[in-house]
Design a protein with these regions (language model features):
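Long, hydrophobic alpha-helical segments that serve as membrane-spanning/inserting helices
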Residues: 180, 184-239, 247, 271
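Intrinsically disordered, low-complexity linkers and terminal tails enriched in Pro/Gly
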Residues: 59-63, 115-127, 223-243, 247
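Long, low-complexity, intrinsically disordered segments
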Residues: 238-279
Length: 279
């Protein structure tokens, strides 16, 4: 994944941290949750460039496709993931989490696009919703439910241009409410108390990762050189740690990372991405 679908890999690592921490707070299985996160989008390996997190500013391949074809490709990552996981003899308990992380949810972005196109063509917005709906089942375990929640929330938080703790918290709560109201959590045993703990935990983890750092007055490389360091690549750990910032290359300064993120968010179009996520 890290080579073929780096955006998906990064997304999987981040939600791995989120679900592990949350599982710990609600007495679910943290290791199962984390490993489930690592494999949940394995199927994206087949067509990585059709998934927004791997496009990195390149053209959006869906621009040339009908909404139903886009939906078919997006939905197929579940089936492809199950096949790949079985081929590589991943334990069944992890394979089960692959279809459950989307449950019976609808790919709202392409469903709405199809409705709009149908209305423009013949005045009727009638579209077969089943073409835009994942096959399920809904999450059957608390770990799979955590994965479903973290999946949507992490993707949504990436679209915030200036992710302050308040904004992250607001989005986490909004997403959890949305998934709860959709009925996707009806077949698992999460309680309302669990959902409250999960929201707090996800907010803490995501704030630690995505909250903007204060920009340095001058590039970190220069500060380091003044302090007697040599190459920028040897800059101090606080400024370059990829563990602190899984979305960035380890050789980037904190300021560059921060700027990159803002550019990235701008390029992708935060509003468009939120629409894609059904918000
Ligand atoms: Fe997925
Ligand atoms: Fe995902």
């Amino acid at each position: 994944l890290s080579v073929t679908a780096p955006g998906t890999w990064n997304h999987s690592m981040v939600i791995g941290m989120m679900v592990e921490a949350a599982a710990d707070t609600i007495d679910a299985n943290p290791v199962l949750a984390r490993v489930g996160a690592y494999f949940h989008d394995l199927g994206k390996l087949k067509k990585p460039l059709y998934f927004v997190e791997n496009q990195a500013g390149a053209e959006n391949r869906h621009d040339k496709l009908s909404p139903s074809m886009s939906s078919l490709i997006i939905r197929s990552h579940v089936k492809d993931g199950i096949e790949l996981a079985r081929k590589h003899r991943i334990p069944q308990v992890i394979v089960d989490m692959i279809p459950q992380h989307h449950g019976n949810s609808t790919i709202e972005y392409f469903y709405e696009k199809a409705r709009k196109e149908a209305e423009e063509a013949d005045g009727h917005a009638e579209v077969d919703k089943s073409l835009y709906t994942y096959p399920g089942p809904k999450p059957q375990s608390r770990e799979a439910a955590l994965l479903m929640l973290a999946d949507g929330i992490e993707a949504a938080v990436r679209t915030i241009s200036e992710p302050s703790p308040d904004r992250i918290q607001g989005l986490v709560q909004k997403m959890i409410n949305k998934v709860f109201a959709s009925g996707e959590l009806d077949e698992c045993e999460l309680t309302l108390k669990d959902l409250h703990s999960i929201a707090k935990c996800f907010t803490r983890v995501l704030t630690g990762i995505y909250h903007q750092r204060i920009a340095y007055a001058e590039p970190a490389e220069k500060i380091f050189e003044k302090a007697g360091g040599k190459a920028a690549g040897n800059a101090p750990k606080e400024e370059t740690s990829s563990a602190d910032d899984p979305g960035a290359s380890a050789s980037k300064s904190a300021k560059t990372v921060s700027e990159d993120r803002q550019k990235e968010a701008g390029a992708k179009g935060g509003k468009e991405d939120l629409k894609r996520l059904g918000l």
